[in-house]
Amino acid sequence: MAATPDDAPGKATWAELGPAARGFRIAHAAFSVIQLSCLGYVWYCALTRRRDRLLTASVATLLFEAGALWVGRGDCPFGPLQSRLGDPVPLFELVLPKRAAKAAIPVLFTIAVAGLAAVLLRPPSRASRTDR
């Protein structure tokens, strides 16, 4: 059978990873799920005009991630650590084809900026002003 780009050397399977790489992959995936949840909540608040502490925490989390990506010059700053732990595969490449994985950061950044703009441009509803 011919090798595909996804079968490229260096793509470690779960069984091939050491305990530190497995733990890091789990933590990294969990943090990614939290970030995607924050992004979803920002959009929920934009659409419903809701304002609360969870929105503030979600925005702070997304801004933290934006800062980390800025430090990493568009790549996850954990990449070198992940490689040193024996896991050379970027997280997005575990679930997306390589080309889509490369596009994920700019696409998610655009969605996040649009969500934050929507929150800022749509005034809060009266009900959410009392939720603080």
Model-predicted regions and their roles:
Residues 1-132:
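Short amphipathic, positively biased membrane-proximal segments
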